[in-house]
Design a protein with these regions (language model features):
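HIT superfamily nucleotide-processing domains
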Residues: 22-157
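Short, basic, low-complexity termini and linkers enriched in Ser/Thr/Gly/Pro
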Residues: 1-25
Length: 157
């Protein structure tokens, strides 16, 4: 039977490992916002960042994130979530100008990446919001062109 100190050591290792994995996963979007991981930037301010989803449902599918690491959107305080929605509205306005559509749909899921984020999706119909649909496969040049169009519109606002 292992000694108490060995069990504590193993527990500490598990906790450390779990924290490292959780922190690493949480940091992916933060690293994108900081420019440590490349992205297709669509808009930004001091608090929030918007970039194209690399597995888009439709062309222009954009993610908005807080720069601050927060897992669950409803863990944000009222003022911060209000500012986040105002930022998302600005990105949606730019998105609609860049990619004319009936409406820009908004979805908050957050099960795959533990960092609060809003999906903004240019919609021609409700089926464009079905996350079970096959994802588009766009070339890097197409992604960059789409991001540039959205960011150009964003800067006008």
């Amino acid at each position: 039977m292992p000694s108490v100190s060995r069990i504590e050591e193993q527990s500490d290792s598990i906790i450390h490992c779990s924290f490292f994995i959780f922190h690493f996963i949480m940091s992916i979007f933060s690293k994108i916002a900081a420019g440590e991981i490349p992205s297709y930037k669509c808009g930004e301010d001091a608090e929030f960042y918007a970039f194209l989803d690399i597995n888009p449902m439709v062309k222009g599918h954009t993610l908005c994130i807080p720069r601050r690491e927060v897992d669950y959107i409803f863990d944000m305080d009222d003022d911060e979530i209000a500012r986040f929605q105002v930022f998302a509205k600005k990105v949606a306005t730019a998105l609609k100008a860049a990619f004319p559509c009936v409406k820009v749909g908004e979805a908050v899921l957050g099960l795959e990446v533990p960092h609060a984020h809003i999906h903004l999706i240019p919609m021609q119909s409700e089926k464009d919001m079905l996350f079970s649909n096959p994802k588009l496969k766009l070339e890097a040049a197409e992604m960059q062109e789409a991001a540039d169009k959205i960011f150009a519109e964003f800067k006008k606002l």
